[in-house]
Amino acid sequence: WAKHMKDMGTQVVFGVTPGKEGQDVDGIPVYHSVRRGIKDHPADVAMLFVPPKFTKDAVFEALDAGIKKICTIADGIPLHEAIQIRRAALSCGAMVVGGNTSGIISVGEAMLGTIPYWIDRVYKKGHVGVMTRSGSLTNEVTAEIVKGGFGVTTLIGVGGDPVPGTRFAELLPLYEADPDTHAVVIIGELGGTMEEEVAEAM
């Protein structure tokens, strides 16, 4: 997925796998830790591909290294650890997107996560922002947006787990500040109050 992200325009400057420092994967240097990598390659975003039981430690490591934007795809992060992740991020002014997300894409610019290779058939550049909790509905709804002649600026999958790192209402100001985004589509899920929070925020 790192190569796919590079192909989509993302500047992937290094990877982290403990015990594998010195290796090179698709032109991406590998380091033992985030702190070691960031000394040689300044970075402001971390994309985490780790199992649920290791996600909290990986998030905390990235936060400790000074990274303020983190995305994690892990599905099924233990509830108490998801709460700890959200609290830690909020306490240091950081943003964690996920878990249980396919990622983030700014169409034609960059992508984080596991958004599919056939992306160019669904995601076309336009002026509609998308926030989603549903993996299964995201591509279908986005395809309809494009079919209607609109296109997408940035899509953020907040994740379908009970306690996401970032909530819809917290993302809304980012879309409002983007001059290329003229409207926002929200794809919700059963349960929770995130959709109501957006209505109140507006």
Feature map (PLM): residue ranges:
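Catalytic-core regions of core metabolic enzymes
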Residues: W1-M202
